[in-house]
């Protein structure tokens, strides 16, 4: 099946999800105004209360979908508490959606270090200065922390904070949705079976 076919209604014939996702993300990168890799990340807290926020997908392969964060943040703590999460991409310009659910793994230190090294210097300083999700008394307090860490790491490399790393959602299900007239949408879900292979099914819209 050609990449063109993968991005039309024929996507329902795709045999596995990752090549299809790559084709759709490529389309979104060309079509969306910005942040085609922006994704809604859903977690639950210790009381089972759901939470959701936008993050940026920073990598994917057959092993899963990777994003990075402060592990001391609300989302970091919620994920560490359950080691499960869900994602939803919605590309409005393409009228497409992809939903991903599964257990979560922590990326290796080597993988986190490699990505951290690609971030702008200001973003690496920010990873140290921001006590993410905790109360902030004023903007000045944040800017002061940024200035302090900028001075501390004025020379040489900025090390990655131990509390800053990446998570990988290992998908159990990946669902593709494409808008059709009269809400008669196309939906296809891939589910990983006990052998690690993908079972595919169409769903009613």
From Swiss-Prot:
Keyword Transit peptide carried by entry: no
Cofactor note: Binds 1 FMN per subunit.
Gene3D superfamilies named in the record: Electron Transport, Fmn-binding Protein, Chain A
Keywords: Flavoprotein, FMN, Oxidoreductase, Pyridoxine biosynthesis
Record's catalysed reaction(s): pyridoxamine 5'-phosphate + O2 + H2O = pyridoxal 5'-phosphate + H2O2 + NH4(+); pyridoxine 5'-phosphate + O2 = pyridoxal 5'-phosphate + H2O2
Keyword Hydrolase: no
GO molecular function, one term: FMN binding
Pfam families: PNP_phzG_C, PNPOx_N
Function: Catalyzes the oxidation of either pyridoxine 5'-phosphate (PNP) or pyridoxamine 5'-phosphate (PMP) into pyridoxal 5'-phosphate (PLP).
Subunit-structure text: Homodimer.
UniProt-recorded name of the protein: Pyridoxine/pyridoxamine 5'-phosphate oxidase
Organism: Mesorhizobium japonicum (strain LMG 29417 / CECT 9101 / MAFF 303099)
Taxon lineage: Bacteria, Pseudomonadati, Pseudomonadota, Alphaproteobacteria, Hyphomicrobiales
């Amino acid at each position: 099946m050609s990449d063109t076919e993968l991005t039309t209604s024929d996507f329902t014939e795709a045999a596995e999800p990752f090549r299809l996702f790559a084709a759709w993300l490529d389309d979104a990168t060309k079509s969306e105004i910005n942040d085609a890799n922006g994704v809604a990340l859903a977690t639950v807290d210790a009381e089972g209360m759901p939470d959701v926020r936008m993050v940026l997908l920073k990598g994917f392969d057959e092993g899963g979908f990777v994003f990075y964060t402060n592990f001391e943040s609300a989302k970091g703590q919620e994920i560490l508490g359950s080691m499960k999460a869900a994602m939803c991409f919605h590309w409005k310009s393409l009228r497409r959606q992809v939903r991903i659910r599964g257990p979560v793994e922590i990326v290796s230190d080597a993988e986190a270090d490699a990505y951290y090294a690609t971030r702008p210097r200001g973003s690496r300083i920010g990873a140290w200065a921001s006590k993410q999700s905790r109360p902030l008394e004023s903007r000045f307090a944040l800017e002061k922390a940024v200035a302090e860490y900028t001075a501390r790491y004025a020379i040489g490399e900025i090390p990655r904070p131990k509390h800053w790393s990446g998570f990988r959602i290992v998908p159990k299900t990946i669902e593709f949705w494409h808008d059709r007239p009269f809400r008669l949408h196309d939906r296809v879900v891939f589910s990983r079976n006990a052998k690690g292979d993908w079972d595919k099914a169409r769903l009613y819209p």
